[in-house]
């Protein structure tokens, strides 16, 4: 029986990962969560994990509900003996647990794009030193991973990420009118609040461009974004002969989570009628309407700590927007200001965490 650790178990990806584990009959040996007491309690009762990590404020109540429960840090949960760790703690808070999982040599099903964006070269160095696998969970990166299988690297001309365009692709004309409630209504995907807002600004796609750059170790200038409102084509690989290879499928994250858990096998799943839309549109992104995508590309050109800084600043800016402190168009403005002020230094674990802390404070100044 495959043993799995789920980091970020009460979030959207974490809960869907547990659904997949239940369907596949896997053993969940560790859970790491935040402050959602009721959801975590249900998971503990169902899975009876060996170790659990949660915010310290929950410890007393968890001990009262589950007297024999062993509490630990997220890093300790990540280091448990298991075949796979699902790394789904959002933001840079998920970086240290992801690193801990990689250092134990297990497969890491990576849903935390910020970890790869901020620390890609460092994580790959750790993975190669410890014999770990890093497989993508993001639908677009899983699509590219699948489309690249069996292909020679020198035959690949471009990697193409698709974006639905979010809820504001065409309206309202004035994005200053956008409220948090409007931004949290994504037309296609079931996701957590932060990534839903990032999808609305297209910064999520910018992070995915940077993730693809680091995950596939591929030149930034050959990674493209196309708006695809139907969200049925998840990623395309363009080859030097002009041909394209695409991965298509329904907008169900469980498929991509499952693939990261079962690869190289595909688990048999009940098939439904093919829901192929009548029309598949592909449009160039409007960088004037969605400048956050342009900021991400600029961070990628600078590389290293610039990617750390914009990722950290975005967490602060999105939270400020959700709290009603700043208007929607202010998010990319804050990212651009922080990027311009980012120091140029070599990327190390020490400089990464230092710039992460600096960028958050810098973003708060502008928020």
From Swiss-Prot:
Pathway linked to the protein: Isoprenoid biosynthesis; isopentenyl diphosphate biosynthesis via DXP pathway; isopentenyl diphosphate from 1-deoxy-D-xylulose 5-phosphate: step 1/6
Molecular function per GO: 1-deoxy-D-xylulose-5-phosphate reductoisomerase activity; manganese ion binding; NADPH binding
EC top class, as a word: oxidoreductase
Residues binding 1-deoxy-D-xylulose 5-phosphate: 113, 139-140, 164, 186, 199, 204-205, 208
Cited Pfam families: DXP_redisom_C, DXP_reductoisom, DXPR_C
Enzyme Commission number: 1.1.1.267
Protein name: 1-deoxy-D-xylulose 5-phosphate reductoisomerase
Species the sequence originates in: Thermus thermophilus (strain ATCC 27634 / DSM 579 / HB8)
Originating gene: dxr
